């Protein structure tokens, strides 16, 4: 699918979609509980992968209007009858690899081409240290993965610099083992807010996990716990809302986005980023509304350590801002659905913007965006960010636009509803 974007601005009021990060975790924890109701979940390709995987591990999940009714396995996942195919969802792969380790049988997990190239070695090594037999069939740390259950609590270490999903996966599984676990993080924990989201959901389900954060971060996880999520309402998604807010800031127009209450989401940093760049923005935390009323943007330096999903959005903001925007501490952004640093550099270059790329850094020199045929890299965040660029440049066509179904299936409808000129076509 392709999308053609014309020069346009935005106006009006819109609701932010539900959080993908919270939805993944709520479904997983509910599937490990008994009876739960999840209100206003995000239903997208990625979260449907988690639903399907949880069902294969023994949970019963029914969609009833804007809620999910979940009868879980009470901490004892079954052995699936077939291979778990997670599609394009790295979150599902990492979470279900650890959850499958709680069972007694053998589980095989795989995914699409992108998933089969993403690293999982540190997670597999820790699971082996905790009494599980877990292997990458090709010996490269990537899917397909084979897990034979028997997860036991113990003392373990894991590298925190590649993906916080490894840590979240272990935090979801380890409280359900018979023995306690001590998990030490080596190096900087990248994308830490996503671990905070995991801890937030686990706390709401009654789990107890203790943190020691002196010289090195350490999680103390008592064993033999039970999850009881009961009822949970998924908050709005700041990652997805970043495109709506950035669109108004870039085009010097006005918008109000609802359903953005405070939570543990690190991507709420988009509000401070836009403010630092010169946008007129106001967040009413009590009402859960964010209003943007244009502004003259200038370049900034952004540390992407905690907020990798904002990198494509900020790269496009930098393309229209005065001066240079420098995105630092961003090597882990290369290990997403695609190498997002490289992808944004390549596509912005096509649109007339000067960029320079280093191992953990992307520099964007603000300039005049020009319409072009650009590649979406089969990556939802690349497609959505380039849509914003097209609204400034006009006459821009983006391929692999179907990638939006991963996290924001209604993205183009949402953008049209607030004034964006977007036209979809089959390739």
Swiss-Prot record:
Pfam families associated with the record: EPSP_synthase
First-level EC class: transferase
Pathway(s) of this molecule: Metabolic intermediate biosynthesis; chorismate biosynthesis
Cell compartment(s), UniProt: Cytoplasm
Catalytic activity: 3-phosphoshikimate + phosphoenolpyruvate = 5-O-(1-carboxyvinyl)-3-phosphoshikimate + phosphate
GO terms under biological process: amino acid biosynthetic process; aromatic amino acid family biosynthetic process; chorismate biosynthetic process
Residues that hold 3-phosphoshikimate according to the record: 20-21, 25, 163-165, 191, 309, 336
Binding site for phosphoenolpyruvate: 20, 90, 118, 165, 340, 381
Entry keyword set: Amino-acid biosynthesis, Aromatic amino acid biosynthesis, Cytoplasm, Transferase
PROSITE patterns recorded: EPSP_SYNTHASE_1, EPSP_SYNTHASE_2
EC id: 2.5.1.19
Entry superkingdom: Archaea
Molecular function GO labels: 3-phosphoshikimate 1-carboxyvinyltransferase activity
InterPro entries for the chain: Enolpyruvate_Tfrase_dom, Enolpyruvate_Tfrase_sf, EPSP_synthase, EPSP_synthase_CS, RNA3'P_cycl/enolpyr_Trfase_a/b
Active site residues of this protein: 309 (proton acceptor)
A GO CC term assigned to this protein in UniProt: cytoplasm
Subunit structure of this chain's protein: Monomer.
Family: Belongs to the EPSP synthase family.
HAMAP family the record matches: EPSP_synth
Function: Catalyzes the transfer of the enolpyruvyl moiety of phosphoenolpyruvate (PEP) to the 5-hydroxyl of shikimate-3-phosphate (S3P) to produce enolpyruvyl shikimate-3-phosphate and inorganic phosphate.
Protein's name according to its UniProt entry: 3-phosphoshikimate 1-carboxyvinyltransferase
Organism: Methanococcoides burtonii (strain DSM 6242 / NBRC 107633 / OCM 468 / ACE-M)
Taxonomic placement: Archaea, Methanobacteriati, Methanobacteriota, Stenosarchaea group, Methanomicrobia
